Amino acid sequence: MAFLKARLAALLSVAVSCSAVLYDDAKKLPSTSYDYIVVGGGTAGSVLANRLTEDAKTQVLVLEGGPSGQGVLELEIPFYNLYGPHDPLWNWNISVLPQDTAADRVLVYPAGRVLGGTSMINGMYYSRGPSSDWDRMAAITGDSGWSWDKIYPYFIKSEVLTPSVGGRNTTGELDPSIHGKQGIVATSSPNWSYETDPLIISALNELGGPYSPILDFNNGSPLGVAWFQYTMRNGSREDAATSYFADKFLGRSNLHVLVNATVDRVVQSKSGGPVNGVEYHLSNGTGSTLHATANKEVIVSAGTFGTPHLLLNSGIGDNSTLASYNVTPIAHVPDVGKNLTDYSTVILTWSVNSTTTLYDLITKNETFANDSLAQWTASHTGPFSNGVSNHMFNLRLNETDPEVQQMLKQYGDPSSSDKAPHITLQFVEGGLGSGNSISMENFVVTPLSRGSVTLNTTDPSGPPVVDAGILTSPFDVFVLEQGILAARKFLSASAWDNYIIAPASGLDAGIPVDGSVNTTALESYIRTQATAGWRETGTAKMSPKGARWGVVDPDFRVKNVQGLRVVDASVFPEIPSLHTQIPIYAIAERAADLIKGSH
């Protein structure tokens, strides 16, 4: 779609500001020694860099593997997250091994390769998760500081609620009393009304029960259907780069950010000593190894794939496995790279009696798309000022159903409580095929399937070997099947009688228009169409201090290693059940306080 591929010149170079703290040349750095080195300037690393440099005497170096995305149109337009995530300019595009449980397909994970990390290319969802998710994390780690009551102030600290643009009346779409007013990351209600919004509201009022509307899913009790909230400011994407790395913070003389700098190893100055430095190279340079020293700590925030890859290459992992890679072990931490956890999702599409579904208009009507882009460029309003969905459905399995009861008896209930969802549906106006349609993205948000991240035996320093483990648990397939039935139930409301035509080809075999269910066809559809949910976590999971399992203690310190912490999505012992962006911001905020308090 050429009309959406507008870019500013010199995308891969960085215009160094007059403050001289954003660099693309290591030779221009003022020093090779800092108090803290943060590996990765993404969703978590940005928070750490910002908060640690609030003390003007603390010197911080951030090493980011990607370029700066400042001023790049495709990273600013909210609606563009439908198109931009796979662009290799901004994305590591992590390929996984063929998944024999998903028709032997090779799936691709987006991972932000840009200052600001995956917050630059994600769906911008503002979701804190159920309170019980956080209470479970506190119980698993033995640290009450991870409970909902203790983490809640960090949500408020990081957020600033802002008005929607374009004059939309957002009354009743959220509860302002539970949102931050003076934080760093801007949030808002949707900026655009879809033609299906009134139909959704009518259907909710008709069906009730699990489809009952709720005011705000960020109060810790998210079950029901609510308006989405987004990390957006004045009609533009709000991300880690525009918030925690805003110009006023990059202007600090003690914050030094080097882009296009990939860290190869964390290192010790002597065997058995603390980690006190890194080796890295510049992607836009000669590839020669460069060095930087941390006087206090090295903090790894390289993400769910990058963090275990870096730890393993540094000799932190299972000793025998490391030896097979010809990597010299420095710490025996066997769980590094294990426990890869992600939602699985399948997109459900129905043809509709309409010619104006938004996504279809944008992708099939170039005049409309160009006009929408022009409107956004002029005023940051219009359809491009919004995310792709206005409503989120958070549902539990129907525990009065004997089949559900049997599955829960066999596999246990992986949700954190009876107030947390198993299923999330996201309504999208548009979809697959040549005609007009609506879609519902169907996620299992309490997956039992697990994967792994390891090194390539022939090239350990090359891209990681990722086995997503998608749909390895029959429970996950069952939950996706139940999600399909829940979506069909919602679309059976009379509000849709003159709008919905039929399920799309493939889906129609599992849920024919006669109302029957073909479970064999449904499973086949899921295994051939399901993909990763792009909320991957868990590969450096947190466990109680002193535990022999896990990778980091509750204060993020890597087990059996001094001077090294991990702060990013990889530390979650269980995947948050409502997106991951905001939980990552929250844990990084607390990590910054813990780090400050330890020195």
Swiss-Prot record:
Keywords: FAD, Flavoprotein, Glycoprotein, Oxidoreductase, Signal
Gene Ontology MF term list: flavin adenine dinucleotide binding; oxidoreductase activity, acting on CH-OH group of donors
Record carries keyword Flavoprotein: yes
Pfam family, one: GMC_oxred_C
Cofactors required: FAD
Residues carrying a glycan: N93, N169, N191, N234, N260, N284, N319, N339, N353, N365, N370, N398, N456, N518
Signal peptide start and end residues: 1-20
EC number, as in UniProt: 1.1.-.-
KW Flavoprotein (keyword) present: yes
Origin: domain of life: Eukaryota
InterPro entries: FAD/NAD-bd_sf, GMC_OxRdtase, GMC_OxRdtase_N, GMC_OxRtase_C
Chain residues that bind FAD: T43, A44, E64, G65, N122, G123, M124, Y125, A569, T580, Q581
Family: Belongs to the GMC oxidoreductase family.
Described purpose of this protein according to its UniProt entry: Dehydrogenase; part of the gene cluster that mediates the biosynthesis of erinacines, cyathane-xylosides that show unique biological activities, including leishmanicidal activity, stimulating activity for nerve growth-factor synthesis, and agonistic activity toward the kappa opioid receptor. The role of the dehydrogenase eriK within the pathway has still to be determined.
Subunit structure, interactors included: Homodimer.
Protein name (Swiss-Prot/TrEMBL): Dehydrogenase eriK
Organism of provenance: Hericium erinaceus (Lion's mane mushroom)
Lineage per the UniProt record: Eukaryota, Fungi, Dikarya, Basidiomycota, Agaricomycotina
